[in-house]
Amino acid sequence: MNCSQFTPCEGRTEIVDADGRLIWHNDDICMVFVVRDNAPVVLAGLSGYGMRPACELNNEKGAFPIVEVLTSISGRTMNHQRLTDTREGSQLRFVAAYTYERGMRHVLRIDQKDEHSGLLTETEFSMFPGVSAVSCQSRIASERRLPVEAVSSLNLTVPLDAAGGGVDGVEVYWADSTWAAENNWHQAPLREIGLPDINTNINPRVPGARFNLSSRSTWSTGEKLPLGVLTMGEGIRRSALIWQIEHNGPWTWEIGEGIDGLHITAGGPNGDDHQWAVVLDERTDFVTVPASFAICSGGWQQVVEQMTLHRRALRSARLAVNGQNHDSEQLVIYNDYMNTLFGNPTADKELPLIEGAGKLGVDVFCIDAGWYDSADGGWWDMVGEWKPSTNRFGNLGLKGIASAIRKAGMGLGLWLEPEVVGVRSPIANELPDSAFFCRHGERVADDGRYHLDFRSPDARAHMDDTMERIIAEFQPKFFKFDYNTVPGVGTEIDAGYLGEGLLGHSRAYVRWLDDLKHRHPELVIENCGSGAMRADYAMLQRLDLQSTSDQCDPAIYAVIAAGASMSILPEQQGNWGYAQQEMDDETAVFTLAAGIAGRLYLSGFVNRMDERRLRLVRGAIEAHRQVLRNQSGQVPFWPLGLPVFSGDWLASGLLPYADNNETGYMTIWHRGGANSVVVEVPQGATLRPFFPKPGLIDKSHGAVDWHVEPLDGTHVRLTVSDNRRSARVYAIDMPDSTK
């Protein structure tokens, strides 16, 4: 196949107007591109929901090219370390533009070429109807050999002129993410986090500074989140922009300043950070990892609403391709791991838990880690066969345990790590080296485990056979796919560069997931990675549930749950609720409250609970099922603003997006400090106790009094009777219109 040419396109050819403008829009988004004979195509205008259309405004000063391509033989046009100002990007020239439909998406493709190097680029923008968001991706090819070390997935000109403000007024929101401390959000003026004003009136060159985040290896959310938010302008022209990178591997995003403008650049792996490169020639082209952005009037909460709608559209489109529906979003799941068995299941332990979970009326009982262990706890470096333990479940065996789960009215769930093989596993000897990540001529091992390379036919065949065997033998309804091994920078097998091998595996793995889902659309699969260490939308548009953390302390879990909707759909947030009999009432409510407005992921020794405590857990499940009825039509909000990881008061909730009088919900946690707080609610809305319902807790068992005091049409004061940790979920009853 000759890759050194443009991909044929049957779409409608778009015409550039007399002013050199190419305008693309729907009812919400408007993008204005400027085409010149002596310059690359630039994004000179951008607007979204609630903003004045960009096509009615002057072009943004200092607009940036729509794609950047960094090569080792031409570099940048100036000396800095950003992903922008690439020489190849600056030499691209407009060839053609096309619009067409792909499923529900409206697509614009802009083709450019550098006649000197032979580089071709096809930059694609796509949007769903009714959503103020756009997906971006580029294909690059070359007529001659060209070594490429970075390509942008998106390169946005921030519409500062349209917002009526400058760089000095820009605020940035970003998040740290590490094991047991996910969703640690921060906010700061851009000028204070790496982009100082260097006075370009005196210094005659583009500033070289940037604010950037990146990830390494395969934990795409293991250090930082692959998204950010930017707010700009004031008053009626105030607007916000959010972006995300949809890749289950390394990524980078940055904010940088030009002479007259600001850019956001985002993409997958690159040479400087990830040892990635690709050499283009007539047989080799390259497609970037996808990225998306949303833009609208208002602040960060309004633009998160739009990204929530976009994530739903991405997920719905993928479900349709794989022949699935949204039924999985109604399931209540019990898992035996968290603060309970911790990966040490036996028949004697499981049967009482199964009976207890059955009495609660949950839909799925998941046996977490250990069901395959015949080594009395020494399974970590022996996994890979995924065959049931011969000594943990007595005469019943795993089949008998599965039968007990079904007799109790629940579906079976099983834990699995598809991508790893223990160094002591028989599978390690059966598969060739080419089935694993290798460096320096040896298999890569991490903590006693090898990492499968899903580009390998042997690796895929092993896991295909494994999944089909388990499904045929045990008829599970649910899988928890975990991921606890990080293989480093990549693999040298069938790759010119280590990062190239890693990218190839990452893409092959999601294709394997698509194939599995297509063969078994009835399967519900959780995405877990030591909690939420790989919670990106390459994975989450395909899988159904995301464990938001492995955090065992409900006091810390509260802030993780409170911030989860910034990056994960509410209907995919598996927030653990691990109530125990020995907890006082308020501690039990505190942990259960985390899952009510997301996805209540139950654990705990339910077999040890008395009837009074079981009523409380049933009350949580009943409240959660009420939320699930309308959850997919609601968007997140934060009545106390951005959750602070060390904050005393935390709050998050759901509001109906459409103009209707559906009920919204607010979860609020008090972890200490002042005994009262004022929350903001929609105009005319009232708060009603939702969980726990009256009678489920009382003062004799440690209950705290909560008092609700309306102050005006949009503010309510909440007061607690003492400083002990406590939480409540309130229903938000709307007036006739919510927006």
Which residue ranges define each predicted feature?
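Terminal connector regions
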Residues: 294-331
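Active-site and adjacent substrate-binding regions of carbohydrate-active enzymes
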Residues: 138, 369, 373, 403-407, ...
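Short, structured beta-strand/loop micro-motifs enriched in basic residues and often containing a Trp
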Residues: 262-272
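Flexible loop/turn segments at secondary-structure boundaries
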Residues: 295, 299-300, 340-343, 371-376, ...
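Active-site-proximal substrate-binding groove within the catalytic cores of carbohydrate-active enzymes
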Residues: 26-27, 54, 509-734
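Aromatic-lined carbohydrate-binding/catalytic grooves of carbohydrate-active enzymes
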Residues: 325-465, 478
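Polysaccharide-binding surfaces and accessory modules of carbohydrate-active proteins
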Residues: 2-37, 41-256, 274, 688-708
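Short Pro-Gly-centered flexible turn/kink motifs
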Residues: 28, 278-297, 725-732
